[in-house]
From Swiss-Prot:
GO biological process: cytoplasmic translation
Gene responsible for this protein: rpl2
Disulfide bonds: none
Compositionally biased tracts (Polar residues): 206-216
The protein's name in its UniProt record: Large ribosomal subunit protein uL2
């Protein structure tokens, strides 16, 4: 009898395939606080599963929150949070107060969502215009996005931009990179497996050895390859 496919095991939802959220130090998002407050960076730490350093900020009312550290941020640095904050590196501002050309990161779409855009290492967005109660920002993908003028953003560029340039050097480093996010690695081709493990496995050489097209109504253990394909291969002519 054959074994379950990888996607069947993942769909069951065992701990092997679940993201280890218990390793995280907390949610990295803005607190839902109104008004203007002054805070201090009390520490810069690593959050497992993230490629950006995380700053722990304590506001004058005692609230602590986690946010992406930006380039140039240091421990014990004073930052300002909320409406009316000056446009200075590390401050959390209402994006409606930012003039055109301001570089921001960790941008909310609407007030209170905690931050949605330009959050990864080395990324930033640029304020390019304003229209009514919306502010237009240019994302790292060069797409123009309209966000609420009440949305909050951090002035500056997210730290850790060189993380993709650092070589992994060995497979063990790549293993742990995927392990902390519960992503399956390495990905093994079906034709490289034994016949008991996959419908494309087995044989004296690596070949599907049977039609790779499969019915839409095929059972889960058979549903691999070209699913309900109208056609396969290159088009002839033209």
């Amino acid at each position: 009898m054959g074994k379950n496919l990888l996607q069947q095991r993942a769909g069951k939802g065992s701990p092997t395939f679940r993201s280890p959220s218990w390793l995280r130090i907390g949610k990295v998002r803005y607190p839902n606080i109104f008004g203007h407050l002054v805070g201090k960076v009390i520490d810069i730490v690593h959050n497992p599963g993230m490629n950006t350093p995380v700053a722990i900020i304590k506001l004058e009312n005692g609230t602590k929150f986690l946010t992406q550290a930006i380039q140039g941020l240091v421990i014990n640095q004073k930052i300002e949070f909320g409406k009316g904050s000056p446009i200075a590196n590390g401050n959390v501002i209402e994006i409606g107060d930012a003039p055109e050309g301001t570089i921001v990161c960790n941008v909310e779409e609407n007030f209170g969502d905690g931050g949605k855009y330009a959050r990864s290492a080395g990324s930033y967005a640029v304020v390019v215009g304003k229209s009514g109660d919306k502010v237009l920002i240019k994302l790292p993908s060069d797409k123009i996005k309209a966000v609420s003028n009440k949305a909050r953003a951090t002035v500056g560029v997210v730290a850790g931009g060189g993380v993709v340039e650092k070589p992994l050097l060995k497979a063990g480093a790549n293993y742990w990179k995927y392990k902390v996010k519960a992503k399956k690695w390495p990905i093994v081709r079906g034709v490289a497996m034994n016949v008991v493990d996959h419908p494309h496995g087995g044989g004296l050489h690596q070949s599907v050895s049977r039609p790779s097209t499969v019915s839409r109504n095929a059972p889960p253990g058979r549903k691999v390859g070209h699913i309900a394909a109208r056609r396969t291969g290159r088009k002839e002519g033209k």
